Amino acid sequence: MIIDSKGRRIIPPSARRFMIVTAIAVAIFVVITGVVIFVTRPPTSDSAATFHRGDWQAPPEALLSSPMRVRPVPGWRVRMTDLGLPESAVFADTELTHEAEPFVGAMEKRAYFMAMSTTDPRRWLVGLDLSTGRPLFSPVSIDPGPDFVKCFVNGPDQVLCAADGKPEGKTATIAWVVDTRTGEVVFNGPTDLHVTPGSGSHLKQVGSYVVAEIQGKGLSGVGPRAETTWLIPDAKKVTPTNRNADTAAPRLAVAEDLAGGPDHAVVFSVVDGTVITPDLGADRTPERAVVYPQGFAILAAGKRGSGLRDTVLFFDNAGNRVGESGIQGSLSDLSMVLPMVQSAPSYTVFGANGAGLIQLPGEGLDAVLIGHRLYAPESEWDGPVKVRRWRQFDLRTGEEGTACLPNMQWYIANDGQVGVFETSQHETTGATFFGMDLTTCEKLWTVPVNWESFHRLWRIDDTLVELSDDGKELHSLVAPA
């Protein structure tokens, strides 16, 4: 999020969609208008196989269940009074509209939100069935007093909330663990785990689980009494956090492995802490790793004096090696859907099986990946007046499609044919969200947004959910009847 000098929101929070930045140099290719199309190379005795594009399939997407070709209208509606909450309540975790992030997380069609009173310190956890908008349980009171509270999804049936206070200048944290099947608070008490960075231990949302980074110890799972469970000694800086993509969250994560030496990476399960130890071959070390829905990739660095070049290796979720780039380049951690390798002045997209898909010139800072489509801007964004073309490519074939003119930078969701995007208040259109045909690039409808309000827009599972300007109503957005 970017805040201007007056503390106002510039970039919509729901627009935190991943951006693609990567590149490589390729040995075998066909150049077509600046685009490299990969061809099949069979394995040899001294190299790993590369895959034909036909072996690759795009990761399954969470598509919107309601068509977006016509401007959507509210479906189910939930207001504070429907939940038995006071008129002073809003869906928010702070009264600062540009900083409010009420959406906690979701497990399939069960979504969780924070609500707060604007006249006193009361807080609540709200659970909704996305199919109907009906409450999953009565709002759960979370009473942190004056302290800020943050909540996390922790596995399929729990939400963990924690509030840091500083009595006598030392961080002290109270935790609430809620059974999301019943709304029962199964634990409420002190914990050694904190939500404030720099406090010795820091809770983070990683996929659908909470991971605690504990200074001087490592990374730990968190149990039903806000206690530590599994431990990966000396690991830190876990990724991905705050992941927003159309694909299911990976069950694996990556961290720096200080125990393994400098510049080492460790891949592990966020469910039980199991460390995945793939075979990199002799004289190679895992310098960087990135996880994806269908596996992970590792930048394997040749040890000094080994004569081996750095290479990117591809693995499935079990750690079985499925491919190798066969080229040098830096593995990008800015895409959490498909492997990306960078080597100026171009960037390249790979399939999770190691199949080279496409290579484009430039840095691609704002490129957007939607299913099997890649949209790459032709130039940097120089200001609100400039209109740039977005080149469209089908990753299944490498063919270039219709170029798009609407700003696609802040992507939200799609129904398979129509994408939904946001714009900021500084663009010529002002703050809006709009629908665009993903094939023809035709803008189909536009809705203006009050960017100084509580308004938010999320894709949660297969549902588009909107928060009203006053923060008092959540509703689904669906095709008109």
UniProtKB/Swiss-Prot annotation:
Q: Where is the signal peptide?
A: none
**Chief location bin:** membrane
* Result of knocking out the encoding gene: Loss of DNA conjugation when disrupted in recipient strain, strain still secretes EsxB.
Chain ranges passing through the membrane: 18-38
Q: Which domain of life is it from?
A: Bacteria
Subcellular localization, as worded in the UniProt entry: Cell inner membrane
Q: Which UniProt keywords apply?
A: Cell inner membrane, Cell membrane, Membrane, Transmembrane, Transmembrane helix
Q: How does it sit in the membrane?
A: Single-pass membrane protein
A cellular-component GO term for this protein: plasma membrane
Please verify whether the record's keywords include S-adenosyl-L-methionine: no
Any idea what job this protein has?
Involved in DNA conjugation in the recipient strain.
Instruction: State the remark under miscellaneous.
Output: In the well characterized mc(2)155 strain this gene not present; it is part of an MKD8 strain-specific insert (RSR-II) between MSMEG_5168 and MSMEG_5169. DNA conjugation in M.smegmatis is unidirectional with distinct donor and recipient strains; mc(2)155 is a donor strain while MKD8 is a recipient strain. Mutations in a donor strain that alter DNA transfer do not always alter DNA transfer in a recipient strain.
Q: What is this protein called?
A: Uncharacterized protein D806_5234
Q: Species name for this entry?
A: Mycolicibacterium smegmatis (strain MKD8)
High-level lineage: Bacteria, Bacillati, Actinomycetota, Actinomycetes, Mycobacteriales
